[in-house]
């Protein structure tokens, strides 16, 4: 029930990664990358499907050799989500995965060979309508830029990116997006700000090598949150040294927190104190796990007492306000019922699922009416 975010998105061109629109006001796509051996087709397919189940719009797969390219062919045949092939150094791998139906190529034109080889890759991408992502990283800047600037700086990342952009411009290829990632939040943020002023292509956001599940999520939330709040960014990846599934969850949590894009339940919960009338922490933790399958956007407030509970419930899809033995249940801001504190988790799960079904049905009817 909260209003949409007052964010003015940066204007950009649009490309398509498979059937997923990127840029020009399209929903910000959330993506991840497999961390299996690509030659282990079964493990890679299983991981991609797990990512798809939690909402991944796009998945990137590393393809460092021709053996992985052959495995990519088999993987592509068994999944539905668009796949990006991550390729460095060998232009022939790019040509091979293009033949196998890749949805996007992640390359740096400067590291796959001479001008003729770059032209071959770009011509192939153009012929097959495959977009390219230019991926600049502070950890792999060109040697001359390292010498020129002494260390990675926003200006160095921008100069590297613009070299690659110029490569594609000279070849009259416009179907690309760009990233300028760094593990330092301020370096990444300022690099993206500079780049956003220079080009109108879509930007892929990320804080690279952000860290483990907790610290990486925090760094990504700060860095990506700053950029997204300024309207910068058309697709994102949260890079974690963790299960890639967590990257998707954190990515959507960042977008939900900024009210940019919603998927699933946005839980609003108090940190608890001695006033709580039921086990708020246990309830929230249990419901987050039980309700991972719900993709319907909903705000659910779970507050342990009457200090802030009623106010939060007024602006939530469903809200619980702690009371003695029984707690008040609100639906769309209206008090509807009371729930037994000793059976809170099961009761609230049932109410949330019922509300999700009701909202899904209402949307289905609306779509049918529009189509008529």
From Swiss-Prot:
Reaction(s) the record says it catalyses: (2E)-4-hydroxy-3-methylbut-2-enyl diphosphate + oxidized [flavodoxin] + H2O + 2 H(+) = 2-C-methyl-D-erythritol 2,4-cyclic diphosphate + reduced [flavodoxin]
Enzyme Commission (EC) number: 1.17.7.3
Pfam annotation, one family: GcpE
UniProt KW Metal-binding keyword: yes
Biological pathway: Isoprenoid biosynthesis; isopentenyl diphosphate biosynthesis via DXP pathway; isopentenyl diphosphate from 1-deoxy-D-xylulose 5-phosphate: step 5/6
Cofactor binding annotation: Binds 1 [4Fe-4S] cluster.
Cofactors: [4Fe-4S] cluster
Top-tier EC class: oxidoreductase
NCBIfam families per the UniProt record, alphabetical: ispG_gcpE (TIGR00612), PRK00366.1 (NF001540)
Family the UniProt entry places it in: Belongs to the IspG family.
The protein, known as: 4-hydroxy-3-methylbut-2-en-1-yl diphosphate synthase (flavodoxin)
Species this chain originates from: Shigella boydii serotype 18 (strain CDC 3083-94 / BS512)
């Amino acid at each position: 029930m909260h209003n949409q975010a007052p964010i003015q998105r940066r204007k950009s061109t649009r490309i398509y990664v498979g059937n997923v629109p990127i840029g020009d006001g399209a929903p910000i796509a959330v993506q991840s990358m497999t961390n299996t051996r690509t030659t282990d087709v079964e493990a890679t397919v299983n991981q991609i499907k797990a990512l798809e189940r939690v909402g991944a719009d796009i998945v990137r797969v590393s393809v460092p050799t021709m053996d992985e390219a052959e495995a990519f062919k088999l993987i592509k045949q068994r999944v539905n989500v668009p796949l990006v092939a991550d390729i460095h150094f060998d232009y022939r791998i790019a040509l091979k995965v293009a033949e196998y139906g890749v949805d996007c190529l992640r390359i740096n034109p400067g590291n796959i060979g001479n001008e003729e080889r770059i032209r071959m890759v770009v011509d192939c991408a153009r012929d097959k309508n495959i977009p390219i992502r230019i991926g600049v990283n502070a950890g792999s800047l060109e040697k001359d830029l390292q010498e020129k600037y002494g260390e990675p700086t926003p200006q160095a990342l921008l100069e590297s990116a613009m070299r690659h952009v110029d490569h594609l411009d000279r070849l009259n290829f416009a179907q690309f997006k760009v990233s300028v990632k760094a593990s330092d939040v301020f370096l990444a943020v300022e690099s993206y700000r500079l780049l956003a002023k220079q080009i109108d292509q879509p930007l892929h956001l990320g804080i690279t090598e952000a860290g483990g599940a907790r610290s990486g999520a925090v760094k990504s939330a700060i860095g990506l949150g700053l950029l997204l709040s300024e309207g910068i960014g058309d697709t994102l990846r949260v890079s974690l040294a963790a299960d890639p599934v967590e990257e998707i969850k954190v990515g959507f949590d960042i977008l939900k927190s900024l009210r940019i894009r919603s998927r699933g339940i946005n839980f609003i919960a108090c940190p608890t104190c001695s006033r709580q009338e039921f086990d708020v922490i246990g309830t929230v933790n249990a419901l987050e796990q039980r309700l991972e399958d719900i993709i319907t956007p909903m705000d659910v407030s779970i507050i342990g007492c009457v200090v802030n509970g009623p106010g939060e419930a007024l602006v939530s899809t469903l809200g619980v306000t702690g009371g003695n033995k029984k707690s008040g249940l609100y639906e769309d801001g209206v008090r509807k019922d009371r729930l037994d504190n000793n059976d809170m988790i099961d009761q609230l799960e049932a109410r949330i699922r019922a509300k999700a079904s009701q909202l899904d049905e209402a949307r289905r009817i609306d779509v049918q009416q529009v189509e008529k």
